[in-house]
Design a protein with these regions (language model features):
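Structural preference for solvent-exposed beta-strand-turn elements
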Residues: 222-229, 235-239
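Long, charged amphipathic helices and adjacent flexible linkers at domain junctions
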Residues: 233-249
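Nucleotide/pyrophosphate-binding catalytic subdomain
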Residues: 1-218
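Short, solvent-exposed amphipathic alpha-helical segments in soluble enzyme
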Residues: 54-56, 222, 246-247
Length: 249
């Protein structure tokens, strides 16, 4: 069965109602015939709150404990989305980075993904699971410690899973309905692009566009992962959003 990766950012899972909406988006793709891997961010504002707690707790900076704390927001979101899907009758299971495992370097707070073995999740798909909900932004080092990938790391997680599982596409759900020539929230004349090349997307990112994290676009370009940027808050059709792909695709 074909696989699809869907990534939901913090605003898309900001509260329980939005998590329910994300579950509906996932169910639509199951109905379209996909096994779905969902990557989730922490609920909007939660990571900043966790960072604040760390800073209030100790003036000492321990990178390993910092990552252990700030990665927990994604774990909460993953569990809540899996429960929401189960409640509607969809076989779903949440996975934290160490459970997959998402193997990374030991550079805490800026780790790089080295490897994502397919076996554990593929086995669950083979036995009836329809949705794997993955906590983004995190992994595990060779020393067995939780690591984080840096701000925007959930985008990188999503692309890495799409490459590892040979997904048909990686859909990035956010609070805008695609990639624009400039920020539509501050510029009325901003124009939405139906498709854009990896190189053009990297150029926009270098100029400050925050729709996709730069590292995730570089990874998508390397492994030829087709990306689609969509709004969580609009009905999705075949022509929705912006497709980010190879110029010749």
């Amino acid at each position: 069965m074909p696989r699809l990766v869907m990534k939901f950012g913090g605003t898309s899972v900001a509260d329980l109602d939005r998590i329910k909406n994300a579950a509906k988006q996932v169910q639509r793709e199951i109905d379209n015939g996909y096994d779905v891997i969902v990557i989730v961010s922490a609920m909007s504002g939660k990571t900043n709150e966790l960072v604040g707690w760390v800073n209030q707790t100790s003036a000492l900076y321990d990178a390993r404990e910092y990552d252990a704390v700030v990665s927990s927001g994604e774990n909460v979101t993953a569990g809540l989305l899996a429960l929401t899907l189960q409640e509607s009758g969809t076989p779903a299971r949440s996975w934290q980075g160490w459970q997959v495992p998402i193997n990374t370097t030991s550079a805490h707070s800026s780790a790089r993904i080295m490897d994502i073995p397919e076996a554990n999740i593929a086995e669950k798909f083979a036995t009836g699971m329809k949705v794997a909900v993955i906590a983004g932004f995190q992994g595990v080092s060779a020393e067995g410690r939780i690591t984080t990938l840096g701000r925007g790391g959930s985008d990188t997680t999503a692309v890495a899973f799409a490459a590892a599982f040979k997904a048909e596409r990686c859909d990035i759900y956010t609070d805008v309905d695609g990639v624009y020539t400039t920020d539509p929230r501050i510029e009325d004349k901003a124009r939405k692009l139906d498709r854009i090349s990896y190189e053009e997307m990297l150029e926009l990112a270098s100029l400050g566009a925050k729709v996709l994290q730069t590292r995730s676009v570089e990874l998508a370009m390397r492994y030829k992962v087709r990306l689609r940027v969509l709004s969580s808050f609009e009905d999705v059709t075949e022509n929705s959003g912006t497709l980010v792909c190879d110029e010749e695709d």
